[in-house]
């Protein structure tokens, strides 16, 4: 339970509940990066990540320990459901730290200077993973309205995951959060209905329906 009434936690919880109705045997991994943020990427982290695994010193493995856990969770997942509120037009720093920790050379993207063409390539392109971003926004009109072009939440998340090869991306958002009036309640109702439909659609797609 969130004491501050997080809309994104409410939507992500609803999606999981709906998913379990369609996929009762699904294994759920829950990670709250808002309450327990991953460590930020540092120079030591980058040095450790770009050092071949067989050459890493003990301190390097320790620096990458949380990143390895997050990458393992990502690799094990069929679907990633992320509650990502909008903070100043972009994702929270805690969620950006999660992104930085899963974009890992040799694990989620490849790099080879001798490779013809681009030296980078996605390592998750054939994994059939899906991502669902459930967001909340204080203002309104981000989808084709007066704030169109100001939303950097979904673009930031989807760009990073597309770089890794995850291209099946979906999103829903609550707006009018700062107004707290009937428009917010209507937006919540629409988002919840959208969550229900999306969970049903994605579950059906898993079974070729």
Q: How would you name each of these model-derived features?
A:
Residues 25-27, 129-130, 168:
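Residues at the starts of beta-strands that form the adenosine-phosphate
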Residues 1-107, 193-209:
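N-terminal beta1-alpha1-beta2 submodule of the flavodoxin-like/Rossmannoid cofactor-binding fold
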Residues 82, 131-135, 171:
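Structural beta-sheet core signal
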Residues 143-209:
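Glycine-rich phosphate/pyrophosphate-binding loop and the adjoining helix
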Residues 20, 72, 121-124, 162:
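Short secondary-structure boundary/capping segments
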Residues 105-110, 167:
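Short, structured loop/turn "capping" segments at alpha-beta junctions
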Residues 111-160:
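Short, glycine-/small-residue-rich phosphate/pyrophosphate-handling segment
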Residues 1-3, 140, 178:
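Short histidine/acidic/glycine/proline-rich micro-motifs that form metal-
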């Amino acid at each position: 339970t969130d004491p501050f009434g997080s809309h994104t936690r409410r939507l992500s919880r609803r999606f999981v509940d709906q998913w379990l109705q369609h996929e009762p045997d699904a294994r759920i991994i829950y990670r709250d990066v808002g309450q327990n943020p991953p460590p930020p990427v540092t120079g030591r982290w980058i040095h450790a990540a770009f050092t071949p695994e067989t050459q890493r010193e003990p301190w390097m493995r320790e620096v990458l320990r949380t990143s390895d856990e997050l990458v393992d969770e990502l690799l094990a997942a069929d679907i990633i459901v992320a509650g990502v509120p909008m903070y100043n037009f972009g994702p929270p720093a805690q969620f950006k730290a999660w992104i930085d920790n899963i974009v890992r050379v040799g694990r989620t993207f490849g790099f080879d200077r001798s490779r013809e063409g681009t030296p980078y390539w996605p390592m998750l392109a054939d994994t059939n993973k899906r991502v669902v971003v459930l967001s909340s926004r204080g203002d309104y009109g981000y989808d084709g309205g007066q704030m169109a072009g100001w939303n950097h939440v979904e673009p930031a998340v989807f760009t990073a995951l597309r770089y890794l090869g995850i291209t099946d991306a979906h999103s829903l958002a609550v707006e009018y959060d700062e107004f707290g009036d009937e428009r917010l309640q209507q937006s919540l109702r629409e988002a919840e209905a959208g969550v229900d439909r999306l969970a049903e659609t994605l579950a059906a797609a898993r079974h070729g329906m």
